[in-house]
């Protein structure tokens, strides 16, 4: 199992709405994330910079790349687009983060 982390950007003033939408995550999206191999998924917010930091675990045989091809993922991205920085294809702009320390 591999742990990865990445950064996204939340638009100023959108904190509460971002939390509200994630508190009511669509069951079919949660199922799709799990089916792709994602587990122990956390998203943290730095309120000063509006950066979101996501951390998740995935197995070697994950299918995360295929999520972009699913209807539910595309609908979620469209639903969230007014809250965060997105690319031309509608997906959130993500910056992979390099692990610097781990204590087990």
UniProtKB/Swiss-Prot annotation:
Homology family: Belongs to the rhamnose mutarotase family.
Active site positions, chain numbering: 22 (proton donor)
InterPro entries assigned: Dimeric_a/b-barrel, L-rhamnose_mutarotase, Rham/fucose_mutarotase
Residues binding substrate: 18, 41, 76-77
Enzyme class: isomerase
Disulphides: none
Its job: Involved in the anomeric conversion of L-rhamnose.
TM helices/strands, residue ranges: none
Gene Ontology molecular functions: L-rhamnose mutarotase activity
GO biological process: rhamnose catabolic process
Assembly with partners or alone: Homodimer.
EC number, UniProt record: 5.1.3.32
Keywords: Carbohydrate metabolism, Cytoplasm, Isomerase, Rhamnose metabolism
Reactions it catalyzes: alpha-L-rhamnose = beta-L-rhamnose
Organism of derivation: Burkholderia cenocepacia (strain HI2424)
The protein's name: L-rhamnose mutarotase
Record has Disulfide bond as a keyword: no
GO cellular component: cytoplasm
Top-level taxonomic group: Bacteria
Localization (cell): Cytoplasm
Gene designation per UniProt: rhaM
This protein's pathway: Carbohydrate metabolism; L-rhamnose metabolism
């Amino acid at each position: 199992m591999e742990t990865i982390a990445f950064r996204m950007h939340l638009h100023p003033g959108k904190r509460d709405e971002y939390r509200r939408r994630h508190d009511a995550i669509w069951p079919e999206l949660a199922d799709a994330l799990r089916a792709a191999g994602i587990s122990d998924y956390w998203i943290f917010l730095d309120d000063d910079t509006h950066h979101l930091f996501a951390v998740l675990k995935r197995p070697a045989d994950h299918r995360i790349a295929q999520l972009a091809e699913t209807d539910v993922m595309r609908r979620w991205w469209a639903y969230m687009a007014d809250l965060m920085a997105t690319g031309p294809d509608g997906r959130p702009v993500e910056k992979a983060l390099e692990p610097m320390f781990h204590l087990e």
